[in-house]
Amino acid sequence: MFLPAEIIAVVECFRPAFTRPTYEKMLELMVGTLLIRGRRTVAGALRGLGKDQETNWSKYHHVLNRAKWPGLEASRLLLTLIVTTFVPVGGIVTVAVDETLERRWSPRISKCGYWRDSRSSSKRMSVSSRGLRWLVFAVVVRVPWTAYELALPFLSILLTTPKVSAALGKPHRTTAEVTGRIVPWLRRTLAGYPIHLVGDHTYAVRELGRICQAHQVALIAPLRLNARLFEAPCRPREKRRGRPPVVGARLPNLNDVAMNPATRWQRSRVAWYGATSAIMDWTTGTALWYATGEPPLLVRWVLVRDPAGKYPTRAFFTSDPHLTPAQIVAGFVARWSLEVTYEESRAHLGIETQRQWSDKAIERTTPALFALFSLVVLMAHALSTDGHLPCRRTAWYAKTAPTFHDLLFLVRQAIWQQILFQTDDFSPDLRNISSPHFERLLAAVCY
């Protein structure tokens, strides 16, 4: 396929994961998905390629529902490409993990279940919706063209409810258990890089923290204000009968620490939401997080209080006691960029518009669309050799930095320019298109 050299350099990294026929069809589906708007289906991608009269169209469906190619290997290649492109050698790799709901209603989808719908729920009412719940891992990176951090997905795993797991005859695994199985793979893939795994309260699990400690991965998550924290056990001066104690005296609840006037607070400016910083009061300490019948988990906790009273007092913890409070707060705040990725993917890449119902096609299509978000950012970065990216501005909207929509425009523009200006070596055609009309046409197609 005739593509710009910068885009070819990005997609060529994934050739080892596919056979030659599958790779060529996958490349065509990717380009067609980028060029079309609306529903992202295989038929729509073929229309975007101009292959709507292809008689052997079923072979493109086979890429998703039948062909043999390793999804985990493709995720490894994407993760390696993201880290080598945006993370300096030896720099910290911040991996955000979260779940998102893809609303699907077909009775043919075997792994469809009822999940809490965070978009429709509120603090007073919880709403459940039928669909597919995805566990998404993304690398949070800083890019040169904006002050905001971007979360680039590289791995998506389909979760199931206990009822669906029982119907399929498979053991049910919670979100934290599935995440714990990915931690060793992360460490093997990113050997030599310090890793910060950031999640919400769903990942504040002692067992997950112990797995992260065993593989030298720092887990950062919120901590309950009534968590059972203990001091380290004291060594007895003389031998005693029985088992040695695993924890020492019980520490006060963090809620009591926040209300205690004797608590020593420190005030500093920390990274906050919206690529800003805020002045916060904080206090920190180390403790053993313990529950009966489990090994204790050594954590560093941070209690954050807003001196202006705008935000509630919150507590965070990390499984790496050597991290500073500023690193812990900044790591958790960076997790929010994954929510922006969800919204951008739904708005511009057609998440939730797929119509496959076979198990293999479902488990491949949505992760491929999330990965396409990362590929668009990588392609735009490769196309902007001078660091300049287009930023669409209007008289009524003062846009200061390019967004994902602008990156998608840049990639589409490069592909369309290759399509419009292809020439034959033997009988080249000369197209006389005025620049203003061409730019209007190109903007209409790409936007």
Q: Where are the regions that the model predicts?
A:
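Single, function-defining residue in the core of a domain
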Residues: 1-14, 22, 108, 146-447
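Gly/serine-rich nucleotide phosphate-binding loop at the start of the catalytic core
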Residues: 1-64
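Short coil/turn segments at secondary-structure boundaries
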Residues: 24-27, 42-47, 75-76, 94, ...
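Short alpha-helix boundary/capping elements
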Residues: 34-39, 53, 104, 340, ...
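Gly/Ser/Thr-rich loops at beta-strand to alpha-helix junctions
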Residues: 36, 101-103, 200-205
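A residue-level signal for conserved active-site and pocket-lining positions in enzyme catalytic cores
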Residues: 45, 137, 371
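Short, surface-exposed loop/strand segments
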Residues: 50-51, 70, 74-75, 200
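Active-site-proximal, Lys/Arg-enriched surface segment
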Residues: 65-157, 287
